[in-house]
Amino acid sequence: ANIARLLKDLSGKKILYLCPSAGLVEQNAEKFALTGEPYSVYSASIGKSLRHDVVFATEGTFKKVSEENGYRFSCVILDEAHRITPTIKKIISDMRAKNPNLRVVGMTATPYRLGDGYIYEIDTQGRKMEEAKSPYFKKLVYAVGGRYLVERGYLTRPVIGRTGVAGYNTDKLKLNSNNS
């Protein structure tokens, strides 16, 4: 949310913050509300407004208006960027057709996908990521390590070893269609 505010302040233009779910739209909008800046929400289950310079939206709802309204935005921030979908790619394509200078910022805690590798081509040191298979993002701009987050209280320190539990009751667990 603070990144959205910073980008809006720097550009003076509209920022679209795309989330994969209404719950994440609400969560990010609530954090942004703490800045005191106005914002809009564009999500079928929450409300639909494009009025303010920062818009929090779900991809499924925003895709219906991306062609007509996408040109208004200078930047798209993708929450959970490791889950980039064909819908998101279409939204960005529609927006870039009318605004070739559109910037896309992806945010994720998990930049590596099993089977696909990294979601970016080049790391912060300028090294090409050989494990990246058709990454959507060109470059990783900033990374925060787990130790940094633990030291500042954002994450709890992991506990390794015995949990004090002799075992778990898995009698009521059901296998899915893949038997997992």
Enumerate the language-model features and the residues they cover.
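Conserved Walker A/P-loop ATP-binding site and its immediately adjacent core
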Residues: 2, 7-34
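Conserved interdomain linker/interface between the two RecA-like ATPase lobes of SF2 helicase motors
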Residues: 135-180
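Inter-Walker segment of RecA-like/P-loop motor cores
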Residues: 32-68
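Short regulatory helix/loop adjacent to the ATP-binding pocket of P-loop NTPases
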Residues: 112-134
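Short beta-strand/turn micro-motifs composed of small residues
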Residues: 19, 43, 108
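SF2 helicase catalytic motif II
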Residues: 59-61, 68-113
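Switch/connector loops and helix/strand junctions flanking conserved nucleotide-binding motifs
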Residues: 25-28, 50, 64-65, 86, ...
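Conserved nucleotide-binding/hydrolysis micro-motifs of P-loop NTPases
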Residues: 22-24, 61-63, 82-83, 109-114, ...
